[in-house]
Swiss-Prot record:
Subunit organization: Interacts with CCP110, CEP97, TALPID3. Interacts with MPHOSPH9.
Cellular compartment(s): Cytoplasm, Cytoskeleton, Microtubule organizing center, Centrosome, Centriole; Cytoplasm, Cytoskeleton, Microtubule organizing center, Centrosome
Organism: Homo sapiens
Biased composition (Basic and acidic residues): 882-906, 1138-1148
Listed GO MF terms: ATP binding; identical protein binding; microtubule binding; microtubule motor activity
Annotated protein name in UniProt: Kinesin-like protein KIF24
Annotated family: Belongs to the TRAFAC class myosin-kinesin ATPase superfamily. Kinesin family.
Annotated GO biological process: cilium assembly; microtubule depolymerization; microtubule-based movement; negative regulation of cilium assembly
Described function: Microtubule-dependent motor protein that acts as a negative regulator of ciliogenesis by mediating recruitment of CCP110 to mother centriole in cycling cells, leading to restrict nucleation of cilia at centrioles. Mediates depolymerization of microtubules of centriolar origin, possibly to suppress aberrant cilia formation. Following activation by NEK2 involved in disassembly of primary cilium during G2/M phase but does not disassemble fully formed ciliary axonemes.
Compositional bias (Acidic residues): 819-830
């Protein structure tokens, strides 16, 4: 038995005194009971800690001896007066037993004086006295988790269970509980088993079988697994005297010893018992944790599933250590990576699979790419309702080392901050996604590791500044949403509230379908963190709501009885409540800067159009939403309005609905439909693929899914205006009906509905929309759709007949639906609408504009010229889709401008042409993925750029308007136009005045219709007053006037070229040349179609702008774009036509395809000091062109349309770059040589006989420099004369220069992004100043590139070019 004595001393950490014990003749454990305090010195035990250990050991042995006597003499009355035992403690509970005897000895006897016994629980239950002693022992020596103590729970039904307990030195650790309880010799312990529903109401989950009974991986039986990991006390905590209060009893049971004080000041220990799927003590390594938690997930993803593993817990509890680990003890990331690569190498069928990694964080509800300089990301939903992180950079890794290096790089970018508990606490949720893809980049499986931000009570925050509070609030809100999602999934609720936070939205794919989730709750053992630890354990327990610990002792009747009661807490956290209230802080945070002039949220609640306002066959769709730009605040509140995304998925920004004049509202409907149509087109095109033609018939089905509701607020408007505007719009709308059934004029619906009824319906629809959209997205937008405004100016004759071709309708509807769907699916998060993001978008819009072209154009390269034209036209339509955003932007711009109606009217003023439009062409044309679609697929930066371009240029609005007008026009045209060959032009020159003066923004839109060669051209000019004056010009000339109230720009009068042979004239290449700013006129035949759509009738007419045109445009960018420039420059450009046969062969083909439709594109440069999207949008809005019969590609002044229409702006270099990139990508585009552009003055090859030049009118001083003459030159023969080899070399030089410029612009873009991200904390004036500096740098960068472009044009342009060179 000496060996048993030695073991006992070892356990008590007294092994060094074993020789002293044997020297005194102590050979057996029971002999230790004879030792007294006087013998300690004889045994050589002088250290006080050792003496305490020895004393406790002797005390335990004496108790056990008395226990043995009690077993042998049951009738003996036990004397317990020396022990403070409450009667309540006699209840059954865990029994900790020390056993130092061999199992064989235990078989021979139930009790032994030699050591502690190991016996069955039935023996305990048979003897209450014995259990009393054990209870006392338990009170004295709570076990510590690090020693893996096992506890048997004594209950009536568990009598047969057999418990074996190991004990370790911690039981004898000095002052284990005395440190907690002070002088209390035997603390009173109350045991509380935290079973399901212990604190949060009764759970609905079913009893789960004990995990110890499971032999298979947990992923085969459960969707969610909750584990707990306890970290050891740190050295610093030990020095501070903190006590370990956590005990890991077994692999599923955890005890927390909480110090409590009764009312009578009696101190006691409250023992909390928790049950989890797996409990890891502090001795467990990351490898142990990995094998039990993540390893089964790796197997799962190789079976084609999704998996998520996330660490949760208080800051400083070991989450990051668990996930990332150290070099010596790698975390779950590294272990999973090793496992993945090992499986890829071993399994032959998996040789073709590759590993991709992405790393981003969610900080304060925003997404940032940690592998791409913290670039802002956006979470969107695709058509399959799968969440896509737009712009997320994914890196392919081929080794564990590279993967860890990538993770290390991203970890350095994480947002951290000092908290009350941890000096370097993670203040963001870090998401590492490891994806397994095949060679075609199809995702085979994906696992996400999430290192959640540290949860912490607001009261514990070290800093009380606003940012810290917002961080904490965001973290806690997202964690609450995460818990609710997991519980809803585990209990199979019908609705899972994924949209309550950005975290759950991003993790949606990890929780649905064939997805497995593992939660690792990390806890600290220190008594200082008791409350945090309990909160973490309760959170984890609530997530799983396990009942396995009580499956034997909880009666069925009691469970059923209590299950009916839901705690108020459960009800409070219901998804409905959270969506409205919990997210409100975020909503306020994001939206407070966007509209300073917006009325109180209550007053701005948007009204929705009555359902009756929509034609019967048109699906309700909503216009895309664009985040309000800063500039928007300038507009009067009355013009603010919100475009609601479709109720299905979109979001409505409550309080953003600005009041609308009824006249606008009518157009709104039709506009919405049109926009929706465009959108759908884009969608379908994406689905069908870049090369496939887009068939409107298919699209129509898509539209039907979408419901459009556009809120309109009442505004006092004369009934005359109302009826005037609405009639046209309604008529147009009815055109859009999908099935081509006779469309009844929408005007009837409007006029028949009492205003109060409309308001009620609008209010209800808007109200219900809010519940279907994340509140974060409900921000105020301060813009109104220009299309709607323009529509009211539409000549009555524009109304469509019932014959509207179904294809067109389906197209528009599809467009609409697609856009809406896409917007909704993408679920524009507040990110996308946030003020900052919009600014960023603005910054990048120029680039986007170029990219927009690329979106459409690059898809059509392989096709024949005719098809290209059609597709380009389609692209134009698609661009409206992309333009949807733009439209919003443009609309927004208009709304900002009190006079926006004028502009809107201009945009809308597309008088119907008299020729049937070639719908089939429209149907066949496919732009490939629409820019919007591309948006979803493209990296964030390009997407933002795209959006930016759209918004800024207003081009988007313009596009939308064009689309709307096109659809209207096309519908009308189809009904009314006798021949497709008639050329109808509508040119709206929109002048953008200084942002401050709405009057200056007035735009004049002149729909020019050439019904026949001799047919009078109707000109609708919109004047500042906002009234459209239809006029006929027998000569066929179109007069455009723009009046500026401020007088900044002198009236610009353009006489449109007369084309006596309207029908015969092929699309002409028209280039608008501005001294300083060259407005591009899209060449109907030559170049790729501008991203802007041409009115549907004019789709044929939509002029693909040749790359040359784009180049010209670039070269013609304003000589000095100064951010402070007051006005966007609008320069009249001569427009020339030449017969298709005289165009370069390619152009001729295009021209043929265009059916000799002429498209004039004016890109108005928006050079205003404000580079915001708002300005751009305004300008873009102004620049919209409507073409009555033949949809015109329209260009917004502020925004260059696709490449050609891009207007140089301070930020336009991006656009130019993109254009160049497009050129590079698509050599097939018309070359400069094809365009035959003169070096500086832009020369379009034209037949002089057929071309009538527009006479340049005085250009605003801002635009034209005195030194830059506008010398349009027409070289009929030089269309394609450049020398190819030399041209290619020169192109390479320009391309290199462009690449450098791209890099510089990217740098400036990043600076601008950073500036915008800091907008909340910066003074706005300072922000504007810094933004102005960035714009100046961008302008210089652009000018540098332009100098190269001018050099190129000088060297390789037509021989006559030099004399017309415009200084750059």
């Amino acid at each position: 038995m000496a060996s048993w004595l030695y073991e006992c001393l070892c356990e008590a950490e007294l092994a060094q005194y074993y020789s002293h014990f044997t020297a005194l003749g102590l050979q057996k454990i029971d002999e230790l009971a004879k030792i007294t305090m006087k013998d300690y010195s004889k045994l050589g035990v002088h250290d006080m800690n050792d003496r305490k250990r020895l004393f406790q050991l002797i005390k335990i042995i004496k108790i056990m001896q008395e226990e043995d006597k009690a077993v042998s003499i049951p009738e003996r009355h036990l004397q317990t007066s020396s022990l403070r035992i409450k009667s309540q403690e006699l209840r059954s509970g865990p029994r900790r037993q020390l056993n130092f005897d061999s199992p064989a000895d235990n078989k021979d006897r139930n009790a032994s004086n030699d050591g502690f016994e190991m016996c069955s629980l039935s023996d305990f239950s048979a003897n209450e006295q014995k259990s009393t002693y054990l209870k006392v022992l338990e009170h004295m020596l709570p076990d510590d988790s690090q020693y893996h103590t096992k506890t048997g729970i004594l209950n009536a039904t568990a009598g047969d269970s057999y418990v074996q307990t190991e004990i370790s030195t911690s039981l004898f650790s000095p002052n284990y509980l005395s440190a907690i309880l002070g002088d209390c010799d035997i603390p009173i312990i109350q045991r509380i088993s935290h079973v399901s529903g212990y604190n949060y109401g009764i759970p609905h989950s079913c009893i789960r079988q004990n995990t110890s009974e499971k032999q298979n991986p947990w992923t085969e039986m459960e969707k969610i697994r909750v584990c707990v990991r306890k970290r050891p006390l740190g050295m610093r905590e030990v020095r501070r005297g903190e006590i370990n209060i956590i005990t890991v009893e077994d692999k599923e049971t955890l005890l927390v010893h909480e110090k409590k004080e009764a009312v009578d000041l009696t101190q006691y220990i409250l023992q909390h018992v928790f049950y989890f799927d797996e409990v890891f003590g502090e001795a467990c390594t990351n490898q142990d944790v990995y094998m039990k938690t993540t390893h089964p997930l790796i197997q799962h993803i190789f079976n084609g599933g999704n998996a998520t593993c996330f660490a949760y817990g208080q800051t400083g509890a070991g989450k990051t250590y668990t996930m990332i680990g150290t070099h010596e003890n790698p975390g779950l990331y590294a272990l999973a990576a090793k496992d993945i690569f090992r499986q890829l190498e071993v399994s032959q069928p998996r040789k073709h699979l590759f590993v991709w990694i992405s790393f981003y964080e969610i900080y304060c509800g925003q997404l940032y790419d940690l592998l791409n300089r913290r670039k802002r990301l956006f979470a969107r939903e695709d058509s399959k309702h799968m969440v896509q992180i737009v712009g997320l950079q994914e890196l392919q890794v081929d080794s564990v080392e590279l993967l860890l290096e990538v993770i290390l790089k991203g970890s350095k970018e994480r947002s951290t901050g000092a908290t009350g508990v941890n000096a370097d606490s993670s203040r963001s949720h870090a998401v590492i996604q490891i994806q397994i893809k095949d060679s075609a980049k199809r995702t085979f499986g994906r696992i996400s590791f999430i290192d959640l931000a540290g949860s912490e009570r607001a009261a514990d925050a070290r800093d009380s500044d606003r940012q810290t509070k917002m961080e904490g609030a965001e973290i806690n809100q997202s964690l609450l949403a995460l818990k609710e999602c997991i519980r809803a999934l585990d209990q199979e609720h019908t609705h899972t509230p994924f949209r309550q936070s950005k975290l759950t939205q991003v993790l949606k794919d990890s929780f649905i379908g064939n997805a497995k989730t593992c939660m690792i709750a990390n806890i600290s053992p220190s008594h200082v963190a008791t409350e945090h630890t309990l909160n973490t354990l309760r959170y984890a327990d609530r997530v799983k709501e396990l009942k396995k610990g009580i499956k034997c002792c909880t009666s069925v009747t009691s469970r059923n009885r209590t299950s009916g009661n839901s705690s108020p807490k459960r009800i409070q956290s219901s998804p409905g409540a959270l969506s409205e209230d919990k997210c409100s802080p975020k909503k306020v945070k994001l939206g407070f800067q966007q509209s300073l002039t917006v009325a109180a949220p209550g007053s701005t609640r948007g009204k929705v159009h009555p359902l009756t306002s929509h034609p019967p066959n048109i699906p309700f769709t909503s216009a895309p939403k664009v985040s309000g730009k800063r500039g928007g605040s300038r507009g009067s509140p009355s013009q603010e309005w919100v475009i609601h995304a479709s109720p299905v998925k979109g979001t409505v920004r409550s309080g953003h609905v600005a009041k609308k004049k009824p006249e606008e509202s009518a157009p709104l409907c039709s506009e919405k439909n049109r926009m929706g149509n465009k959108t759908v087109l884009g969608w379908e095109s994406r689905a069908s693929g870049p090369g496939e033609g887009l068939v409107r018939g298919k699209l129509s089905t898509k539209c039907k899914k979408v419901q459009t509701v556009q809120p309109v607020q009442k505004q006092l408007v004369s009934r005359v205006e109302l009826s005037f505007g609405n009639a046209h719009h309604r008529a147009e709308y009815s055109q859009d009906s999908q099935r081509g059934t006779p469309a009844r004029p929408a005007s009837e619906a409007w006029t028949n509905i009492p205003p109060h009824q409309k308001e009620r319906e609008e209010h209800l629809r808007f109200y219900h929309q809010q519940f279907q959209q994340p509140p974060l997205l409900q921000q105020k937008l301060k813009y109104q759709p220009l299309k709607r405004s323009l529509r009211q100016y539409r000549p009555p004759e524009g109304q469509l007949t019932n014959e509207t071709p179904p294809l067109f309708h389906s197209y528009s509807e599809n467009h609409d639906g697609a856009q809406v769907e896409e917007l909704d699916d993408s679920d524009f998060s507040e990110d996308s609408f946030s003020h900052i993001s919009s600014q960023r978008a603005t910054k990048q819009r120029n680039t986007l504009e170029n990219s927009e072209d690329s979106f459409f154009l690059h898809q059509t390269w392989g096709q024949g010229p005719e098809k290209q034209v059609a597709e380009r036209q389609q692209s134009l339509f698609s661009s409206p889709r992309t333009g949807d955003k733009k439209d919003l932007t443009k609309s927004w711009v208009d709304s900002r401008d009190p006079i926006n109606h004028r502009r809107a009217a201009l945009d809308h003023s597309c008088s119907p042409s008299k020729g049937p439009v070639d719908w089939s062409r429209e149907n066949s044309t496919s732009s490939g993925p629409s820019p919007r679609d591309s948006l979803a697929e493209k990296p964030y930066c390009s997407q933002v750029d795209f959006i930016y371009r759209q918004e800024r240029g207003g081009g988007s609005s313009f596009d939308l308007r064009k689309d709307a007008s096109q659809s209207e026009v096309s519908g009308e045209n189809e009904g009314n136009l006798p021949s497709p060959e008639e050329d109808g032009f509508t040119i709206s020159l929109s002048h953008v005045a200084v942002p401050g003066s709405p009057d200056q923004r007035d735009t004049v839109t002149t729909p020019l219709r050439e019904v026949s060669a001799d047919g009078p051209i109707q000109v609708t000019s919109t004047v500042k007053n906002g009234h459209a004056v239809p006029g006929e010009d027998p000569r066929g000339q179109l007069g455009t006037h723009a009046e500026y109230a401020s007088g900044l720009m002198s009236p610009l009068t353009m006489s449109l070229l007369e084309n006596p042979d309207n029908e015969g004239s092929p699309p002409s290449e028209q280039l608008v040349q501005d001294g300083a700013t060259h407005s591009l006129v899209a060449e109907s035949t030559g170049g790729p179609v501008v991203s802007h759509t041409v009115p549907s009738g004019d789709q044929e007419a939509a002029l693909p702008v040749s790359s040359a045109t784009r180049h010209l445009w670039l070269s013609s960018s304003p000589p000095d774009n100064k951010p402070g420039g007051d006005l966007p420059a609008l320069s009249p450009s001569p427009i020339r036509q030449h017969p298709a046969d005289k165009l370069p062969s390619r152009e001729a083909d295009l021209g043929e395809a265009c059916q000799s439709r002429e498209t004039v594109l004016f890109s108005h440069e928006h050079m205003g000091s404000e580079q915001y999207d708002a300005d751009a949008e305004e300008t873009g809005l102004d620049g919209s062109w409507g073409f009555p019969g033949k949809p015109f590609t329209t260009i917004h002044m502020g925004v260059p349309h696709s490449g050609p229409t891009l207007t140089p702006r301070t930020g336009s270099s991006d656009v130019a770059d993109q254009l160049w990139a497009q050129e590079r990508k698509h050599p097939t585009r018309l070359g400069w040589q094809e365009f035959g552009l003169s070096t500086d003055p832009i020369k379009l090859p034209c037949n002089s006989e057929n071309v009538t030049w527009l006479k340049p009118r005085p250009i605003s001083r801002c635009l034209a420099r005195p030194s830059s003459p506008l010398v349009p030159s027409c070289s009929p023969k030089t269309a394609g004369t450049l020398r190819q080899p030399t041209l290619e070399q020169a192109q390479q030089v320009v391309i290199r220069a462009h690449q450098e410029q791209l890099d510089e612009m990217a740098e400036l873009g990043f600076k601008e992004e950073t500036l915008m991200s800091q907008l909340a904390s910066n003074d706005f004036e300072d922000f504007v100043t810094q933004l102005d500096e960035i714009m100046v740098l961008k302008s210089k960068c652009i000018q540098s590139l332009r100098s190269q472009l001018q050099l190129y044009l000088t060297c390789h342009g037509p021989t006559a070019a030099p004399e017309g060179t415009v200084p750059s």
